[in-house]
Design a protein with these regions (language model features):
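A structural microfeature
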Residues: 62-63, 210
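Short intrinsically disordered coil segments
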Residues: 82, 238-244
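C-terminal "cap" of GNAT-fold acetyltransferases
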Residues: 219-231
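Long, contiguous binding/interaction regions
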Residues: 233, 237
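Short amphipathic alpha-helix that is part of the acyltransferase structural core
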Residues: 1-62, 69
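Acyl-donor binding region in acyl/amide transferases
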Residues: 73-207, 212-214, 218-220
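Short, flexible loop/turn elements at secondary-structure junctions
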Residues: 15, 55-57, 69-71, 102-104, ...
């Protein structure tokens, strides 16, 4: 088990049904979902490890993510991302890879340390397990792509993955932004509009798919996001390992 100390937050695994249900309720609110159960739950919850970040004083959940480790790229077809993207090109990895999902924070908490703790945990896990590739689906709020045209134009221009690793289309409802958005945009403005999680991936050397999936269940647009651990700038890697 990875151990962290932070003056305001506790980061801990959800190990029992009560904690997992609390996490599912938090995810439901964070993603703005609407259903009768009031929970965001799926069949992958049984396959993933769940991590909760709590406000130490009130024990309130303020952050969450789930993850699972595969011994090689040949095993990723059983994961969440593979249900939305054709990941056959990533079977090339012959060392451990890590899938991360459902990363969310409490917007009312408004504290960047919550997301930093997510990355700190993942950085230590990557080091401990010799992970070579980190991946997942990174979401834009809502399904109206017009709000994010600048973001998609920048992703197309600067952050598409290598051709020999790009996921192919698998979902029926997709936005092929690499073919659609070619306009010049203000990079600084576009990066400010970018979801914080995706921005962090990109700043560490991450890349995205050439299309987004329109996920009506989660009320999001999401892109496949990949990060080759060897491409993370050394200074950034050292910084993450020193948090908190």
């Amino acid at each position: 088990m990875l151990i962290f100390f932070h003056p305001k937050f506790d980061i801990e695994p959800a190990l029992n049904p009560v904690d997992i249900k609390e996490a599912q309720a938090f995810r439901y609110k964070a993603f703005g979902m609407v259903n009768e159960s009031g929970l965001d739950k799926d069949e992958y919850d049984q396959k993933f490890n769940h991590i909760i970040i709590r406000d130490r004083r009130h024990r309130k959940v303020v952050g969450y993510f789930r993850y699972t480790c595969y011994s090689s790229g040949s095993r990723i077809q059983n994961g969440y991302s593979a249900a939305h993207y054709d990941l056959k090109a990533l079977e090339r990895f012959d060392k451990p890879v890590l899938e991360v999902g459902r990363v969310c924070t409490d917007p009312l908490a408004n504290d960047p340390d919550i997301l930093r703790l997510v990355w700190a945990y993942l950085a230590q896990f990557v080091e401990k397990r010799n992970i070579v590739f980190v991946f997942g689906c990174t979401s834009f709020e809502g399904t109206d792509y017009k709000k994010y045209i600048d973001c998609f134009a920048v992703l197309r221009a600067r952050y598409l993955g290598p051709k020999n690793m790009l996921p192919s289309v698998k979902s029926q409802s997709v936005l092929k932004f690499a073919k659609k958005f070619r306009s010049e945009v203000n990079l600084k403005t576009a990066m400010m509009k970018m979801p914080p999680l995706l921005r962090a991936y990109l700043l560490m050397g991450g890349w995205v798919s050439d299309h987004a999936v329109i996920d009506n269940k989660l009320n999001t647009l999401h892109v496949f996001t990949g990060l080759e651990v060897s491409k993370i700038p050394p200074a950034k890697r050292r910084f993450l390992l020193k948090i908190p």
